């Protein structure tokens, strides 16, 4: 039914149009709506939350809504000044139909047939597509602009962010190459230790033994995996690294559940 009177928290993951249509129904009796779509992310009165970074923002929610950031934004945020990122986003980012299309195309090519293109702009199998979502201002895609705006909102800062988002022929788990510039030079060992201690992050970084994160081994796991940590040769204040995360887990479901767990721990779900 449409009565959320006895519901404390509702996880909404049915797309932006559904979120906009049902938000008032869900929240009018005090239920907290944790929304996985992009519908409310940039509303000034809706907190955008990654629990490990800005959990307390979830406590102030005038509309009764908390937005879950875009999956690639969640993977990247950390207290920094300037970021360049190139994303390598799996077919699963386009949903079940995206994964099925990649699988169908690979099978068709294996049979010597012409692959069918429906969900993506071009054939994804054995290809890279440097476009995710439609093109917007300054020839950036909407996905790239989401990373820019959402990261700045989560960090409460004028952080400089530039992204290039690429769809890759991987079934599940997004990867990112990230270049970070800080205000002062950082010791690499200190950065490594910070990653090691950070909640929700697993450091997989041993180049001598070829240890680094790969989507093949990270699908269906919760943490963000970080490796290839090194100094940026182009900047004395720069660090560069590689990270991989299953965007269906930390990028959506897990982050939403962590927000709810934080609200419970803070006693923030009791209805007045």
Residue ranges and their predicted role:
Residues 1-122, 160, 224-225, 229-234, ...:
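N-terminal Rossmann-like NAD(P) cofactor-binding subdomain of oxidoreductases
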Residues 5, 59, 80-197:
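Active-site-lining helix/loop region of Rossmann-like oxidoreductase modules
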Residues 47, 51, 69, 108-110, ...:
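Proline-rich low-complexity regions
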Residues 14, 71, 120, 139, ...:
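Catalytic cores of large soluble enzymes that bind and process phosphate-bearing ligands
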Residues 159-272:
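C-terminal active-site/capping subdomain that shapes the small-molecule cofactor and substrate pocket
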């Amino acid at each position: 039914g449409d009565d959320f009177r006895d519901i404390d928290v509702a996880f909404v993951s049915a797309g932006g149009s559904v979120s906009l249509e049902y938000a008032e129904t869900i929240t009018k009796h005090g239920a907290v709506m944790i929304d996985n779509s992009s519908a409310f992310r940039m509303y000034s009165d809706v907190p955008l939350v990654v629990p490990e970074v800005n959990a307390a923002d979830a406590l102030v929610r005038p509309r009764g809504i908390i937005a879950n950031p875009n999956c690639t934004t969640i993977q990247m945020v950390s207290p920094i000044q300037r970021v360049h990122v190139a994303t390598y986003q799996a077919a699963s980012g386009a949903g079940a139909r995206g994964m099925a299309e990649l699988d169908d195309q690979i099978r068709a090519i294996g049979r010597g047939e012409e692959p069918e293109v429906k969900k993506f702009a071009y054939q994804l199998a054995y290809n890279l597509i440097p476009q995710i979502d439609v093109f917007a201002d300054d020839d950036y895609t909407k996905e790239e602009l989401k990373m820019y705006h959402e990261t700045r909102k989560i960090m409460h800062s004028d952080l400089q962010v530039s992204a290039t988002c690429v769809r890759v022929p991987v079934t599940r788990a997004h990867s990112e190459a990230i270049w970070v510039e800080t205000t002062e030079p950082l010791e690499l060992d200190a950065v490594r230790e910070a990653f090691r201690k950070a909640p929700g992050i697993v450091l997989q970084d041993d180049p001598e033994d070829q240890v680094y994160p790969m989507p093949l081994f990270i699908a269906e796991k919760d943490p963000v995996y970080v490796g290839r940590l090194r100094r940026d040769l182009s900047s004395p204040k720069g660090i560069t690294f590689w990270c991989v995360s299953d965007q269906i887990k930390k990028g959506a479901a897990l982050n939403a559940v962590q927000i709810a767990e934080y609200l419970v721990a803070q006693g923030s779900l009791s209805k007045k």
